[in-house]
């Protein structure tokens, strides 16, 4: 097993504000329609309602990346997702292409969903809760049972400092947040060896009795990484070296106050926009241009509620695409195009801490929170309005999150692992399993992490609890293990404060 200690101080990169160049180039998103490598040209079908096609000239010096690997125009194939940076004459300087792979679960039943992670390979986990923000990995060929001692360790990294951030993984880098001294720090490691790559200061450390440091997980988008600290410090940095592109404090800019246990949101990237929830008087939820940090819109939700501890999701299987998230006392839906508030419901919200990220399938949204509150299912109409289908106390989920597979919700109802039928809200089975914790799914299995340490593997089936492996996490900190487990690239990642443990779980 490889191991190392992350030394942040020598790695922190000086702030570099990029101004020149932003207005001289544009970024285009779409799907490859035609490639003429002999003529150095590529044509893509543009995303969005406007659609259309656009042709680019690709000079010999242009950078071409396919699934994170350096390639040439001759390797590009029709159907790949494409992100192209080009000048005003349509001369491309950078092409980032990805093979589209369907993210399958065990098929779909009524109310089920096969995640659509177009353009993201199984070896990537670029944000909180994975490509679709649903904690469902696209990995296949994984161990379906573990030896008594657990899976084989791959590498370990220490020196990450305090915090509950999990990891984001893309282009061979593992990126998380931690602390050094009085600073919150963004940190990158090599995904194969764990070797330290770089560190960048985010802001000052927030201290409280439940554990100091950051709570959110970074979001990687193409060649940039975005992260939000516990004091509201928002950072955009280059993913290769950690050079800072822009930064701001969202609480100061939008008139928000920090929440009891610190800002915990993991920001969402959707096209050109970064979505976050400052919970301020000048914007409950906001969209910022991801390249510059400038405000695109600020959503004035009634009552100007503070932020919650949840993170937003995209719901586009309705009349108009919207963002859904928790705020302090309710669940809200906001129109993606302009930030117009569409609906607000408090059936599954509490006034203490709403932590779990919502789930969705089609026009249904499932939410749950702790502190005795419970869960709710909402149906979104063609006008985007959310209507309550049911609410009950079958899933009182604190902050371990839930997964939705084939029409069934799996998650921890306080101390008990449950399987709930999404359509009815009724419990199919329950088991004490590892006790209160978090859950991730991959290859037909549930990966269960107790906040007290044990890790277990069980089948993701509504037929009953079938545990096929368990081990005790070594190097336990004195804090609850609240960072969600991640399955990516044939490995299981477990962050516990100062330490990141990585295990081989490929067959």
Q: What annotation goes with each model-predicted range?
A:
Residues 2-61, 65-110:
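Short, flexible, surface-exposed loop segments at domain boundaries
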Residues 106-507:
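Noncatalytic, solvent-exposed loop/strand surfaces
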């Amino acid at each position: 097993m490889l191991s190392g200690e992350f030394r942040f101080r020598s790695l922190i990169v000086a702030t570099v504000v990029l101004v020149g160049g932003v207005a001289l180039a544009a970024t285009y998103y779409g799907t490859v329609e035609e490639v003429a490598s002999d003529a150095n040209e590529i044509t893509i079908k543009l995303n969005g309602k406007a659609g259309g096609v656009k042709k680019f000239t690709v000079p010999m010096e242009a950078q071409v990346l396919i699934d994170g690997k350096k390639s040439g125009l001759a390797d590009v194939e029709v159907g790949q997702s494409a992100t192209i940076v080009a000048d005003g004459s349509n001369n491309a300087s950078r092409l980032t292409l990805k093979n589209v792979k369907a993210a399958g679960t065990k098929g779909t039943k009524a109310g089920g969903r096969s995640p659509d992670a177009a353009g993201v390979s199984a070896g990537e986990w670029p944000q909180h809760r994975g490509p679709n923000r649903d904690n469902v990995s696209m990995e296949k060929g994984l161990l379906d049972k573990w030896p008594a001692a657990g899976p084989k360790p791959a590498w370990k990294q220490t020196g990450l400092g305090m915090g509950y951030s999990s990891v984001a993984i893309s282009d061979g880098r593992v990126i998380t947040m931690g602390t050094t001294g009085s600073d919150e720090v963004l940190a990158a490691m090599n995904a194969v060896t764990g070797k330290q790559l770089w560190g960048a200061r985010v802001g000052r450390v927030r201290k409280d009795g439940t554990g100091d440091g950051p709570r959110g997980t970074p979001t990687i988008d193409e060649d940039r990484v975005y992260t939000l600290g516990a004091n509201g410090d928002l950072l955009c940095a280059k993913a290769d070296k950690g050079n800072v592109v822009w930064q701001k404090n969202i609480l100061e800019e939008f008139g928000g106050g920090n929440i009891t246990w610190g800002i915990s949101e993991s920001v969402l990237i959707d096209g050109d926009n970064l979505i976050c929830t400052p919970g301020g008087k000048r914007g409950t939820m906001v969209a910022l241009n991801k390249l510059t940090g400038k405000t695109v819109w600020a959503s004035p939700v009634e009552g100007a509620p503070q932020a919650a501890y949840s993170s937003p999701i995209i719901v586009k299987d309705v009349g108009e695409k919207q963002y859904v998230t928790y705020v302090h006392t309710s669940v809200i839906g906001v129109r993606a195009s302009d930030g117009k508030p569409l609906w607000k419901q408090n059936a599954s919200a509490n006034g203490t801490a709403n932590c779990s990220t919502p789930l969705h399938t089609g026009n249904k949204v499932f939410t749950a929170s702790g502190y005795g509150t419970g869960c709710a299912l909402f149906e979104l109409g063609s006008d985007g309005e959310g209507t309550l289908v049911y609410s009950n106390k079958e899933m009182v989920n604190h902050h371990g999150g839930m997964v939705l597979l084939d029409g069934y919700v799996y998650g921890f109802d306080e101390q008990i692992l449950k399987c709930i039928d999404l359509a009815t809200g009724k419990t199919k089975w329950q088991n004490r399993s590892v006790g209160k914790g978090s859950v991730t799914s991959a290859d037909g299995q549930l990966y269960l992490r107790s906040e007290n340490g044990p890790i277990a593997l069980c089948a993701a089936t509504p037929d009953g609890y079938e545990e096929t492996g368990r081990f005790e996490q070594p190097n336990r900190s004195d804090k609850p293990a609240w960072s969600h487990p991640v399955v990516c690239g044939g490995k299981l990642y477990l962050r516990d404060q100062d330490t990141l443990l990585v295990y081989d779980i490929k067959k």
